[in-house]
Amino acid sequence: MGIPMQIYQDGKGVQFYHTRYQNVFDERASKYGNYTVNNDYPQLPDTIKEHIDQLTFSNVGEDGGDVGNYSEEDDDGDEEKELEDVFRSNRGLEFVRINNYFTTHDLQSFKSFRNFNSKYWIFYSNQAEDKKLLLYDFNGQHLIFIKQQFYGQLNLLLSDAIICMDCNFGYNSNTIQILVGFQNGKLLKLNCDLNGNVNNHLLLKDPSTSSHQSHLSILNVWAGLLPHFVVSFSLKDGLLITSLDHQQSNGSFQSFHTNIDLPVDLRTTTNVKSVLNFPQFTLYKGNDMIFHCKNLLGSDASTLNKEINFMLKIDEDVQKIDYLLKTNHILLETNMRYLSIPTRDPIENSNSSPPVSDSEVYPIFYKTQELHVHASGTGRQIANNGKYIFITEQHLYGTALSVYKYSISFKRWLFVGYSDIRAKYGIRSVKDLFVGNCPSVNSPVLTILTDDNNIQTILLK
């Protein structure tokens, strides 16, 4: 019925696909059942690839390795840490509150994103008559209200429904560049100072149609290569890299397509979930299958180099996917539970390697019956920093904060412990949750948006 199936003959994968796509004139489509959605854009030149490689290497160094993956070598010195976590689970968790910031803005109706390097929390309101955009600086622990010189100008720029956002510094640390992807396919870049004053903006992508079909939406943006490049993903154009150093005669900026091909039936899929952590890209398109590419610029990126099959329970739906960067795992949230699914390096993902099976899909946390029937985002929040996963649940008499850690030794997630943050800090309901790291003490730091507009920061001892 149009659902791709995978069989293995003589160690080689053969994929079957819907017959109405078999006449697509593309060698890769004939072989893999995939197609290239962005043939209208030129191929990414090698010189730009080299420039991007340099920028990516520089960003990893500046971020202290948080962008990288967690290896078994990194875990050699963690045996004592695992014993400490077992001790924590026996005696309970201890947190220390290090900041309590109260905002006059009502953030309860706002949606939020964490930017690519976890330096900013981006809040926005999609209300038609009053568009608002705010940044929370994790290091400075304060809010930046984004504003235009003329009243109503920001409402005009943000007039369409926002799907995704990201931000980064400009050519210097005194300017912030904010990327905004819209439902109608528009891609906007705002330049502002550290006080939130927008001094100029660029329309990087302007759809020629006003249609709001789902395949036009910009689903993901990546600001990690600013101020030189922007990475975006949509079902219409696939993964594009837009160069801000190459402006065309008509004023638009040149976009290039990557080598990656996408599943043949992607445009007809209604439950697409995707996450972009350049150069990684992961896509869930339903049918209990995840497509994962470790390096978009790699020579083997002409197909998503990992197909991960798994099974869901009856009436179980995928709500969100995310990365657990330091464990080479994907975090999958459904309406019933949280799952951790491993990905392999390309060298391990050879033709002779078996596909990921259900035995390698690790349940982390089963949602309680009274909460998992509610809408997504009510009563429960989750955040991770790669090593630790934090989950909050609001109950009748308390608000529990549970902590899990992945063990390389045991190949599973271990329960570290929990704390009642309502009894300790008066936090009744958690609207949003973020976890970072405090380098000075090598311990996770949680930033919690509460239902009374407090932004509380607590440290795990």
From Swiss-Prot:
Predominant location: cytoplasm
Alphabetical keyword list: Cytoplasm, Nucleus
GO cellular component assignments: cytosol; nucleus
Superkingdom of the organism of origin: Eukaryota
Gene Ontology biological-process entries: glycerol biosynthetic process
Region: Disordered, residue numbers: 58-80
Transmembrane segments: none
Subcellular location: Cytoplasm; Nucleus
Ranges of biased composition (kind: Acidic residues): 71-80
Main function: Involved in the regulation of anaerobiotic glycerol metabolism.
Protein name stated in the entry: Protein YIG1
Source organism: Saccharomyces cerevisiae (strain ATCC 204508 / S288c)
